[in-house]
Amino acid sequence: IVVEMDPIKTSFEKWAKPGHFSXTLXKGPNTTTWIWNLHADAHDFGSHTNDLEEISRKVFRAHFGQLAIILIWLSGMYFHGARFSNYEAWLSDPTHIKPSAQVVWPIVGQEILNGDVGGGSRGIQITSGLFQIWRASGITSELQLYCTAIGALIFAALMLFAGWFHYHKAAPKLAWFQDVESMLNHHLAGLLGLGSLSWAGHQVHVSLPINQLLDAGVDPKEIPLPHEFISNRDLLAQLYPSFAEGLTPLFTLNWSEYSEFLTFRGGLNPVTGGLWLTDTAHHHLAIAILFLIAGHMYRTNWGIGHSLKEILETHKGPFTGEGHKGLYEILTTSWHAQLALNLAMLGSLTIVVAHHMYSMPPYPYLAIDYGTQLSLFTHHMWIGGFLIVGAAAHAAIFMVRDYDPTTQYNNLLDRVLRHRDAIVSHLNWACIFLGFHSFGLYIHNDTMSALGRPQDMFSDTAIQLQPIFAQWVQNTHALAPGSTAPDATASTSLTWGGGDLVAVGGKVALLPIPLGTADFLVHHIHAFTIHVTVLILLKGVLFARSSRLIPDKANLGFRFPCDGPGRGGTCQVSAWDHVFLGLFWMYNAISVVIFHFSWKMQSDVWGSISDQGMVTHITGGNFAQSSITINGWLRDFLWAQASQVIQSYGSSLSAYGLLFLGAHXVWAFSLMFLFSGRGYWQELIESIVWAHNKLEVAPVIQPRALSIVQGRAVGVA
């Protein structure tokens, strides 16, 4: 049996002793530093004990608490939809009425935030996309939202109970946490497989019929309730005749019978401007089948299937030494290493989601709600950025706390660490190259523009730098439905090309996005900022245990201010310091992405369409010619758009104005820390000097980082 019964008795005594988890903090405060350390270490389970089983149980228990908080938060969202929103009004006229789910009380004049959202209601216009997802899932009344909110609270209570139960009553043993094959099978088949299958089932039996009727203009109050569709097959058969045949076509392999509600059309629904919900139901069913198969691939009690340890240990090539040997032990004993990998993958996936939300808008009427589109893109980019920086943070914690050099000899990890100087100096060169060349193209354009020589600028109308590879990818995908997917009526996304335009309620939902010289230029800025972020984060991980500047870093821990008073040049050199220096560049990278997205969409996609079919874009298609100079970015995007936000203070949009101001305050605050990163720069310089020595081109005069005082002088200037 893999659980231990009644390991820890339930008591509230410890709650009365702040800092009970630490010998030093439990004594109580001497200075104000105590409260900071209390917050820093309360959830750092690795510092409370060295017992991996106990740490694992605490993390496992915390996950249930986290789920409870998420469910309570979601319940609040649904409750607002049920109690304070105009959802039913929006549902009846989604092209004219704006979504609102919060009405501000008249306290100290805050009621200015309540704008006219149409349909006779006033409130804050929301940009979370919840109304659109509710419609897609078949919610037709505020009562249904209310019931869902109550359901979420019940689930939250269950999660809190589970957290208590699996720590105090039946706690899993370490072996259970380390049984990776069983975990993979259950997560793949259970969470992803059955999860997707149940969502596909909900879509087919509830969402599709309700949305079909809504699209046809049926009054939401006339539509049968969800449980009626589930219990009464005749209702579904009226909309999809093949429902009358039940499961016979499934078992007789006559699957094409189901093609009424499991489609492969591509493109967007012209009524709602969202993906065809019959396509998404088909997609989730297919995903479910794939993951149910994947959940049977790993070897557990029966002697068949994959063993991860075997896979990793036999995975070696001619140039990689011991290959992946030793990684299995790392990933089953260091949860930081495990978390780092998961954060890196989930962060990348979140950014992929950001780009799919606008190019393949999944919910009805999402594509014509431009504020929501912008918010969802921004949200997913930020979340992805945070997760990726978090990956580097936990990789560095793994290096400091969990890495044992004696067990890792000549495997991939060891080999990467041994040639870290080459990695960092090459990456540094790539950053310098990208920075000078990408900005150089802009500076050239600014100069030529100032000298009145437009024919010498890099632009679509002068010296062209067309993104030919991106255009080739677009073209291939635009042509795909005719060849690789003969039954599809349109390509996966209208953005690829092919001339299709979908407009809903006189607004453009989506159209082919042209790429030109302006995009080529800004994409190289993206490449530059991403590489700088990677340089900082990777340097933090590779030099987390030691460097030429501080050979004994591993003994100082993950975060330390300076290596003692006698070594002033060693400040801001810990692995933790690299995290916030990396965050700064992540913010820079993400800002350029969001600027690019919002201007490009307003210039080339979003806008209104006349009865004659003439499209008028919000900023009139000025991206291609304006964004090719720094001056154009400053004047036609930053100033042109910020001035509206800055002047919003007397209107219902003032909250956005304040958030805009606050976000810039946060960014400016982060600048302050950059200018004193003395040790960080010295450490980087020593890697680069190593590269020069190796090529025998090292200068006689030693390069040295600015002192903290010099750095601050530069910062002030």
UniProtKB/Swiss-Prot annotation:
Q: How is the cofactor bound?
A: P700 is a chlorophyll a/chlorophyll a' dimer, A0 is one or more chlorophyll a, A1 is one or both phylloquinones and FX is a shared 4Fe-4S iron-sulfur center.
Q: Name one GO cellular component term.
A: chloroplast thylakoid membrane
Q: Which GO terms describe its biological process?
A: photosynthesis
Would you say which domain of life the source belongs to?
Answer: Eukaryota
Task: Quote the record's binding site residues for phylloquinone.
Answer: W681
Q: Top-level EC class, please?
A: oxidoreductase
Molecular function, one GO term:
oxidoreductase activity
What membrane topology does the annotation report for this chain?
Answer: Multi-pass membrane protein
Q: Which reaction does it catalyse?
A: reduced [plastocyanin] + hnu + oxidized [2Fe-2S]-[ferredoxin] = oxidized [plastocyanin] + reduced [2Fe-2S]-[ferredoxin]
Among SUPFAM superfamilies, the record links this protein to: Photosystem I subunits PsaA/PsaB (SSF81558)
- HAMAP family, per the entry: PSI_PsaA (MF_00458)
- How does the record describe its quaternary structure? The PsaA/B heterodimer binds the P700 chlorophyll special pair and subsequent electron acceptors. PSI consists of a core antenna complex that captures photons, and an electron transfer chain that converts photonic excitation into a charge separation. The eukaryotic PSI reaction center is composed of at least 11 subunits.
Instruction: State the family named in the UniProt similarity comment for this chain.
Output: Belongs to the PsaA/PsaB family.
What's the protein here called?
Photosystem I P700 chlorophyll a apoprotein A1
Annotated gene: psaA
